[in-house]
Amino acid sequence: MAHQLIEGQLAACVQIQEGVYSIYRWDGKICEEKEVLLSAKTIADKWIDISSFIKIHHPYDLPELIAHAPEKYEAHYGKWVESEVK
C-alpha cells in the first residue's frame, strides 16, 4: 500500500512502523492484533483521494484514518511535499 501511495502521487513519503499492538472492542468482542502503522506525508487536498484509496485496499472494514495538520514545518520540506504529490 505504501508503494502505491507514492507511485500514485498521493503521498511524498510514507513511514512504516511495524510492531504496533492494538487492543480494541469490535462487534462486542475484545480484540488484540499486531498491526502496522503507516504515516503518509501529503497535502490537505489529497485527503479524499488517500482515504478512498485506503478504504478500498485495507483489509479492515473500518481502518483508522486520521489527519494531523502540522503547526509548523520547514519551508523547503513543504515545497518538496507539494511538488511530489501534484
For each of these PLM feature ranges, what is it?
Residues 1-86:
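Positively charged, small/polar-rich N-terminal and surface patches that mediate targeting and assembly
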